[in-house]
């Protein structure tokens, strides 16, 4: 048993070290500096520098905000894989449910007094679109000039951006009482950015700028608490709260720079092998205030295996969305200028999740899942896989 613990600790230390070692020597500028260089230095003469600058800054700020928002709101594992209760008839502690619970949606059952867990999750994400616009194929137009009545511009500047994140999150849960538990998540993030800006004038392409940056470090730490108000077998109701602390580097887009608080209500119903779970909450402060909601269906496929499907949603208030504006050129008759900028508006973001929880041995729990966006709001990847290992202490 001692050897196993040493191996686990070494594995965790190695994974975190590899992330923190990612700051390369040639990326002395911050990620936000490189992003600003790629987005704001537009070269097409439009005759209106002020509007050009305003649109470029708004675009840069929106892309930065959406990246930080994605890192800050990427779902983290729910607590309570193993749940326990005292059986008065037997006078001993037994499993409160045969199910290992949802993936990201919280459930009302708690860990139990004196119970604790420690785990590590890993996720690697390559983002390929933002607000429905491709980031990687060179079709993201920053500025363009077009003759009125034509279908294609004669001078167009496009941006290509490749964002990739690798995240290792250390998770822990402690049961304070049978009705109260506390958990925390500590993310370590490696962020890579590569991009270029290309001008296409009447079919002649010229690379205007290119750049890359890489950084790694601590993200925003999450602390949660759940309190069980009512329990009937494996069903019940609970209230919870989540605090995200601004521990990530804001300049390198690893953190939000502000504390957010999310109170939530949690409900669960379990009957035989099937469970239905739901939660609703509201995020205050942070990158954007948001109504959050989630629902999950769990099925005990075998004594050691739980299958899970979930729907996760957020209604974001005044989040920036990329839009194109078209205005007449102030000096050239019959020519319009197209600019990429942003507009603050309320937007809905939905994710569907499928995965499983497998009790591989003793109280070791392996969780594997994949997320798929159902809307084009914000920064998106086609698929977001993640794997988590948890150990529950007896």
Language-model region placement:
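A subset of solvent-exposed loop/turn segments in beta-rich extracellular surface proteins, enriched
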Residues: 28-183, 187-219, 323-335
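Residues on the lipid-exposed face of transmembrane beta-strands in outer-membrane beta-barrel proteins
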Residues: 100, 106-107, 118-120, 170-176, ...
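Residues that define the transmembrane beta-barrel architecture of outer-membrane proteins
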Residues: 100, 112-116, 164-170, 212, ...
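Extracellular loop and loop/strand-boundary signature of outer-membrane beta-barrel proteins
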Residues: 103-105, 154-158, 206-212, 249-253, ...
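Transmembrane beta-strands of outer-membrane beta-barrel pores
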Residues: 122-128, 186-192, 229, 243-249, ...
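Repeated loop/turn-to-beta-strand initiation elements of outer-membrane beta-barrel proteins
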Residues: 127, 180-184, 232-237, 273-278, ...
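Outer-membrane beta-barrel translocator domains and adjoining extracellular loop/strand segments
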Residues: 130-135, 195-201, 239-242, 249-257, ...
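Outer membrane beta-barrel transmembrane domains
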Residues: 138-142, 148, 206, 296-394
């Amino acid at each position: 048993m001692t050897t196993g613990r040493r191996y686990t600790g070494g594995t965790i230390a190695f994974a975190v070290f590899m992330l923190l070692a990612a700051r390369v020597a040639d990326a002395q500028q911050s990620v936000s500096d490189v992003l600003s260089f790629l987005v704001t230095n537009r070269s097409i003469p439009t005759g209106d520098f002020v509007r050009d600058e305003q649109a470029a800054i708004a675009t840069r700020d929106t892309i930065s905000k959406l990246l930080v928002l994605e890192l800050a709101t990427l779902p983290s594992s729910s607590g309570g894989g193993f749940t326990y209760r005292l059986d008065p008839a037997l006078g001993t502690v037994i499993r409160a449910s045969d199910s290992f619970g949802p993936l990201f949606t919280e459930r009302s059952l708690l860990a139990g007094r004196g119970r604790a867990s420690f785990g590590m999750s890993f996720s690697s994400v390559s983002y390929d679109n933002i607000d429905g616009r491709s980031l990687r194929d060179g079709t993201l137009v920053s500025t363009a000039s077009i003759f009125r009545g034509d279908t294609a511009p004669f001078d167009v500047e496009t941006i290509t951006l490749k964002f990739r994140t690798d995240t290792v999150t250390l998770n822990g849960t402690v049961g304070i009482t049978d009705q109260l538990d506390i958990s925390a998540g500590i993310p370590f993030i490696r962020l890579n950015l590569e991009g270029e800006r290309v001008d296409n004038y009447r079919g002649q392409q010229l690379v205007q700028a290119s750049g890359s940056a890489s950084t790694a470090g601590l993200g925003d730490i999450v602390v949660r608490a759940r309190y069980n108000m009512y329990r009937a077998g494996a069903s019940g109701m609970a209230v919870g709260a989540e605090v995200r602390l601004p521990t990530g580097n804001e300049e390198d887009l690893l953190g939000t720079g502000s504390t957010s608080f999310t109170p939530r209500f949690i409900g669960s119903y379990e009957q035989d092998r099937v469970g239905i779970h739901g939660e609703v909450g509201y995020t205050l402060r942070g990158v954007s205030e948001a109504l959050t909601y989630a629902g999950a269906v769990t099925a005990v496929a075998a004594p050691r295996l739980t299958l899970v499907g979930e729907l996760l949603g957020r209604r974001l208030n005044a989040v920036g969305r990329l839009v194109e504006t078209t205005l007449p050129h102030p000096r050239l008759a019959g020519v319009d200028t197209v600019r990429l900028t942003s507009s603050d508006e309320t937007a809905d973001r939905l994710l569907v999740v499928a995965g499983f929880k497998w009790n591989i041995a003793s109280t070791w729990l392996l969780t594997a899942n994949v997320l798929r966006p159902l809307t084009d709001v914000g920064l998106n990847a086609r698929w977001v896989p993640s794997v988590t290992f948890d150990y529950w202490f007896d």
